[in-house]
């Protein structure tokens, strides 16, 4: 659910430019201002500055630790190390709680109010919902409150800073994701191949059936034509019986008749 970082880059760039020429207490003051600044929720570039890293070896090391905590940590991390860290202003406290919500949202699509109340050390539901609404308006998360089931349903959240030591894990996760995609693609290709084979076999069978039907039609047509011719011939024979020749009187009969007449 983690998404691209929302606009805070211009303001952060201004702080980075100021920090490059700053040291000592002036730098710690600048860090405090960055941690309070509205819209600034990523701190990796500031942490990479050499003079900021130099704070680790001086009296102001706690401010470097605090900056690291805002970059990678959560509100429970601050509470666990509160004694060794500078005290937070109200604005810084709310921002760290917002970042804690982002961290939870990157792992869970539906965050129970009970989890939020525990991690943010809040007891009042109304205050919790107001804090969530603030986070939504700052565009670091998108979602809705399910008051009936007491859930925060997350649709989107920004991405937080990434430690260098975590990059290998991210690369490993991406490789696993790519392997999974390749396996899915291979499965789809096999299904397409089977579908094409089925289609080809079906088409071949259909052609065979059509050829057989055509042959049967031709046979039936030829048989019907032959039967019709035979029937016509039989009808013709019935309507026209064979002609019998009449006997012609012979000359002997005529002679006999002449003899009879002469005797009279």
Swiss-Prot record:
The keyword ATP-binding is assigned to this record: no
UniProt main location, coarse: cytoplasm
An annotated GO cellular component: cytoplasm
Pfam families, per database record: CSN7_HB_subdom, CSN7a_helixI, PCI
Annotated stretches, region: Disordered: 223-264
UniProt keywords, alphabetically: Acetylation, Coiled coil, Cytoplasm, Nucleus, Signalosome
Domain PCI: 2-159
Recorded coiled-coil stretches: 194-237
Biased composition (Basic and acidic residues): 235-248
TM annotation in the entry: none
Self-association and partners: Component of the CSN complex, composed of COPS1/GPS1, COPS2, COPS3, COPS4, COPS5, COPS6, COPS7 (COPS7A or COPS7B) and COPS8 and COPS9. In the complex, it probably interacts directly with COPS1, COPS2, COPS4, COPS5, COPS6 and COPS8. Interacts with EIF3S6.
Record's protein name: COP9 signalosome complex subunit 7b
Species whose genome carries this gene: Mus musculus (Mouse)
GN (gene name): Cops7b
